[in-house]
Each structure stands twice: as structure tokens, then as C-alpha cells.
Regions:
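Signature of uroporphyrinogen-III synthase
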Residues: 1-157
Length: 157
């Protein structure tokens, strides 16, 4: 019997659980990290966004990496988080990364942008200010959908 092969290109250290799942399904994963995550220096736009955190109604983290790189930028300017800010994440892994840093975030049962967009808290967003924390050039579905629903979307990337 010949196993089907799948190439995993996620950053180093991020492939093990996925490789294990594929192996359990009878696939033969090859791990070749082709992506390297690096911290982007804080620029004036990032600083402006961080300083205005209290102007946002909701903040969404799209990955564990967005927590790792984005949350410290915000923490530099906010020793205590704005009380009215609603925290959201795309799934349980990202929510857990936030929780380990003292932030409780809502997340959907179905992880991902589509699941997040189905949450009750994102159904009526017209006039809301939403900050999405993501990597440079991340997926557009979340921001586009929220914008089409009348929200004002800003990216911290």
C-alpha cells in the first residue's frame, strides 16, 4: 500500500500536531517549514493604533502568532485594558494563548473566520470600531465581511 504524502510548510514548531492528525488518517506528512515568523518593528501607525485602543469596540486576534507579536505592542501603552473592549479570537488555541497572558476572549465552536463571523456578537456591527490583529498581509475575509456589515475595521499587523 502506498501512503499519500502531504507537505506541511507551517513555521518550525507548528507542524507536529497537524502531522500527527494526518498520520492518524493514514497520510504521510513531510515537514518542511517554509515560513518564518518575525517580529515587525513598531512603526508610527502601529503606535497610533495602540494608543487609541480605547476607541475600539471589539478586538479580534486571528492566530496564536498575532497574540505573540501583537499583544505586547498593545501592553506597552495599556497597563490596564479598556473595560468596554470585547475580546475575540478565531478559535480555542488563540483564546488559550490570550488567556495565558491574562485576557479572556470569546471564540466560536467552529474555529476560523467563518465560525467567528457567525458569533452573535458579530451579527450587528454597523457603526462599531473593530481592531483585527494579524500578520502582515493576512486573509481579508473577516475584515471585508465586517466592513460590508457597516463596521469600521482597522488592522494591527
Amino acid at each position: 500500500m502506498h501512503l499519500k504524502t502531504i507537505l506541511l510548510t507551517r513555521p518550525s514548531g507548528a507542524n507536529k500536531s497537524l502531522a500527527d492528525l494526518f498520520r492518524a488518517d493514514g497520510l504521510s506528512p513531510i515537514v518542511r517549514p517554509l515560513i518564518e515568523l518575525a517580529e515587525k518593528p513598531v512603526d508610527l501607525e502601529m503606535k497610533r493604533i495602540a494608543l487609541n485602543l480605547d476607541h475600539y469596540d471589539k478586538i479580534i486576534f486571528v492566530s496564536k502568532s498575532s497574540v505573540r507579536f501583537g499583544l505586547p505592542i498593545l501592553e506597552n501603552y495599556w497597563p490596564q485594558w479598556p473595560i468596554s473592549l470585547e475580546w475575540l479570537s478565531v478559535g480555542p488555541g488563540t483564546a488559550e494563548a490570550l488567556k495565558q497572558l491574562g485576557v479572556v476572549a470569546s471564540f466560536p465552536d467552529l474555529a476560523g473566520s467563518e465560525g467567528l463571523l457567525a458569533l452573535e456578537g458579530l451579527q450587528e456591527v454597523a457603526g462599531k470600531q473593530i481592531l483585527i490583529v494579524r500578520g502582515v498581509g493576512g486573509r481579508e475575509l473577516l475584515g471585508q465581511s465586517l466592513g460590508e456589515s457597516g463596521a469600521s475595521v482597522t488592522y494591527l499587523e
